[in-house]
Structure formats: C-alpha cells, structure tokens
C-alpha cells in the first residue's frame, strides 16, 4: 500500500544474497546519501558523544569511523551482508569503539530491550521498501528499532522518502514517537541562480500538517534532497 516503487528497481534490496554479491563486486567504501560532515549538525544535536548508538544497515560506509574520530565512544554496526561485516571487522579490528555484527534489521533479538540511546538509519528502511513484502518488512524493522531504544532515545532516519510515503510507517501510535522532520540538500547542491527563497537554518524543522504531510506552501529547492526524520521515543512521564 505504501511502497514507493517509483524509486525502486528490479533488485531485492532486502535480500542478503544481493548485497553479498554487490560488496564482493565493488569492494571499497561507500556512504549512501550523505557524509558525516553533512550530517554532523544533526547527529551532534541529538546524540551526545557518550551515547550507545546502533548503526543499522552499515554496509561499507565510513560514517561510523568519522563519528569515532569526532569523539563518539560506542557504535554497534549491523548489516545483513556477511561480506560487508567481515570486510569492516578486518578494517576496524583495532578501533574498540566500533563493533560489527551480521544481522537482519527485521530480527535483532540478539539485543535486549532498551539497549541503545540512538539508532541511525541511512537508507536501510528505503532498501526494505524496495524489497518483497515491503510493508511487512518495514513494520518488523521499526518494531525492533522501537524495542531497542531506551525511553527518550532517538531513531534518526535519513531517506529520500517524503512524508507522504514515510509517515504512514513511522507515525503508528504503537511506537509512541515524537517526530521532527528536516530536509537536507544532496552533497554539492547549489541554489539556482535567481532563487528568491530565504536562507533557512539547517536545523530548522519542517512544520508538518495535522495529517503528517508537507505544508502546501513548502518549497523543495533540491528535488533530490533527503529528509531526516528524528523519532524520539517518548517517556511515560512525557505523555
């Protein structure tokens, strides 16, 4: 129902076989969507350096390494691809702040409830939304993310999906998340000449409508920009 197939292709991005083959073929490092330097204002704003962080769908990205260089103390990285995890374990063998585990984000039962202060998702839900049984996979992943977050913890999702296709999944009452939305242009984007839009602070949230959609007068200057959904797990006392 809410599978945004316009951004998908014929590959099953929820399948470990696909990712194993891709990492064997490509090797090297690759950061999806945004680099740490672009995301740093958001990450430092929402995640103290002492946070216990889970990076889901880590692949062979260097964002966790960059976060450790910036002072982050504990990042657990998981990915469905054993090829990627083996590669990253060897690469970061002597960096104790980084741990790598092969795991399906739809079943993270290895971890006890409320294990993490923060969960970072850079394109992982997007991948599941391009796989088979996408709505089921999304629900399984988000339920696990919610379970693993401590009360007051934060799930940060970086995605190409606008609120029309993402809010139906993340705004379910069962998760009890307070959601704040941001927009960030793709790396290297420059405003078109003659643009009259006012300069906004990067950390200025987008005011969603009551239906959880973008305001009618909100202008998306970069059509290939990314959305950042900050989902804070509400404590009982905050309700």
Can you say where each PLM-predicted feature lies in the sequence?
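Core SAM-dependent methyltransferase catalytic element
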Residues: 193-239
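Conserved beta-strand signature within the Rossmann-like core of class I S-adenosyl-L-methionine
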Residues: 151-159
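A short acidic, Gly/Pro-enriched loop at the edge of an enzyme's catalytic core
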Residues: 106-119
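A short SAM/SAH-binding and catalytic strip from SAM-dependent methyltransferases
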Residues: 117-136
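Class I SAM-dependent methyltransferase SAM/SAH-binding core
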Residues: 52-108, 143
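Conserved Class I S-adenosyl-L-methionine
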Residues: 139, 143, 163-207, 219
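Conserved alpha-helix/loop element of class I SAM-dependent methyltransferases that forms part
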Residues: 31-51, 62, 66
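A short glycine-rich, Lys/Arg-flanked "PGG" loop and its adjoining helix->strand segment in the class I
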Residues: 135-151
């Amino acid at each position: 129902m809410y599978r945004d197939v316009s951004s998908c292709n014929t590959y099953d991005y929820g399948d470990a076989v696909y990712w194993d083959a891709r990492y064997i073929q490509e090797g090297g490092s690759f950061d999806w969507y945004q680099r740490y330097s672009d995301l740093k204002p958001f990450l430092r704003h929402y995640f103290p350096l002492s946070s216990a962080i889970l990076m889901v769908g880590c692949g062979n990205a260097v964002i966790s390494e960059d976060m450790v260089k910036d002072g982050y103390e504990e990042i657990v990285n998981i990915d469905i691809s054993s090829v990627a995890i083996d590669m990253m374990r060897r690469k970061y063998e002597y960096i104790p702040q980084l741990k790598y585990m092969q795991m399906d984000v739809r079943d993270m039962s290895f971890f006890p409830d409320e294990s993490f202060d923060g969960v970072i998702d850079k394109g992982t839900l997007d991948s599941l939304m391009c796989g088979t049984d996408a709505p089921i996979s999304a629900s399984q992943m988000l339920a696990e993310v919610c379970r693993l977050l401590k009360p007051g913890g934060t799930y940060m999702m970086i995605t190409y999906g606008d609120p029309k296709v993402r809010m139906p999944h993340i705004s379910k009452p069962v998760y009890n998340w307070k959601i704040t939305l941001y927009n960030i242009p793709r790396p290297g984007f420059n405003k078109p000449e003659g643009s009259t839009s006012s300069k906004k602070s990067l950390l200025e949230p987008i005011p969603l409508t009551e239906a959880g959609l973008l305001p009618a007068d909100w202008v998306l200057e970069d059509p290939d920009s990314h959305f950042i959904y900050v989902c804070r797990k509400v404590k009982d006392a905050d309700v």
